[in-house]
Design a protein with these regions (language model features):
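Extracytoplasmic copper-binding redox domains, predominantly the cupredoxin/blue-copper superfamily
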Residues: 2, 10-11, 17-104
Length: 104
């Protein structure tokens, strides 16, 4: 039993610092643009898209790595970056809106 408690404590010590180091980044959707248009984050970080326009938008990766579906006006959507790579994304409703999420 004592060994099991020690194992649980060691595992908790290994897991907790990773979560504590994760950062949150914000992409603002406004005036038919994603701001910033290019964002680089680390694996495990969270990205929040906030729609400040008066109509819905999406944040949809070209390779379907993520898809917010409709983000209503004054609403938000978040995504945890789990896989490294370069993710070009756009708004399905307004195809001229493009941006890039880099995950290191």
């Amino acid at each position: 039993m004592r060994d099991m408690r020690l194992l649980v404590c060691v595992l908790a010590a290994l897991v907790l610092p990773v979560d504590a180091m994760a950062a949150t980044y914000v992409v603002v959707i406004e005036q038919m643009r994603f701001d910033p248009p290019t964002l680089t984050v680390a694996r495990g970080d969270r990205v929040v898209w906030i729609n400040k326009d008066l109509f819905p938008h999406t944040a949809t990766a070209d390779a379907n790595a993520f898809d917010s579906h409709d983000i209503a006006a004054d609403a938000s959507w978040n995504y945890e970056a789990r896989e490294t790579g370069r993710y070009a994304y756009s708004c399905k409703l307004h195809p001229t809106m493009h941006a890039v999420l880099n995950v290191r």
